[in-house]
Regions:
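Solvent-exposed, flexible loop/coil residues
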Residues: 28, 64, 74, 124-127, ...
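Rossmann-fold dinucleotide-binding core
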Residues: 1-79
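Generic hydrophobic, helix-prone segments enriched in Leu/Val/Ile
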Residues: 37-39, 99-103, 183-190
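Metal- and O2-centered redox machinery and metal/ROS homeostasis
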Residues: 6, 10, 144-147, 199
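Helical "substrate-binding/catalytic lid" subdomain
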Residues: 70-176
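Alpha-helix boundary/capping residues
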Residues: 12, 53-54, 108-112, 157, ...
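Short, basic/aromatic-enriched C-terminal tail that caps enzymatic domains
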Residues: 172-199
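Short, basic, helix/turn surface patches
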Residues: 44-55, 129-131, 175-182
Length: 199
């Protein structure tokens, strides 16, 4: 959150060092679309030396917090949508309508279904760290008068995934042949275990 970045800036600058706020968006360098490193603060152009063909550096006005803010807004949409997709899939499974939902998505929103199949099965690998990111997003929006509840809920979904049997995987070790149905079954088992523990 921008407020978190400003708190860190105070600590670092009090110690006598310079602080430049940064937020990176995109996959690691070497992929089709280069990542974008957003920077802001005191003379952020100093980090333009990091620019290269496979990484773009973009400076922002607005001081410390601006780079963090754009990262929060982008992740709110991108990763927030991942949790909504997971919520819908697990919810449909719990309601006994997984096949019916899949058929409806295939008919009405085939691109949405394809996107879900391409990412939901492996979300558990990053869920633990992304949960904290959702809470930072919630704080970002609360600080400007918007509801934090959407992304507090997103954090809860990532917590559920982090409790699942798939969470021991990393991006490198994740089973890439896993189907969306297998992932939803694992997430549903995590949900059932929580219910038993709460009983």
């Amino acid at each position: 959150a921008p407020a978190t970045s400003r708190t860190i800036a105070d600590i670092i600058e009090t110690a006598g060092a310079d602080y430049i706020d940064g937020g990176i968006i995109g996959m690691p360098p070497g992929r089709k679309n280069p990542p974008r490193l957003y920077v802001s603060g005191d003379r952020p152009e100093r980090l333009e030396v990091l620019a290269r063909p496979d990484m773009i550096v973009r400076t922002l006005d607005g001081g410390v917090g601006a780079a963090s803010a754009i990262k929060m807004c982008y992740a709110a949409l991108n990763k927030g949508a991942m949790t909504l997709e997971t919520l819908v899939l697990v919810g449909a499974a719990q309601l006994g309508l997984a096949s019916e939902l899949r058929r409806e998505l295939a008919d009405a929103q085939p691109q949405t279904l394809e996107r879900m199949e391409g990412r939901v099965p492996w979300l558990a690998a990053d869920a633990e760290r992304w949960s904290g990111e959702m809470l930072e997003i919630a704080r970002t929006f609360a600080d400007v008068g918007l509801t934090p509840l959407i992304h507090e809920g997103a954090a809860e979904i990532f917590d559920l995934l982090a409790d699942s049997s798939l969470a021991s995987e990393t991006r490198e070790t994740a089973n890439r042949s896993r189907t969306i149905e297998e992932a939803v079954a694992a997430f549903s088992a995590s949900l059932s275990a929580r219910a038993r523990d709460a009983a």
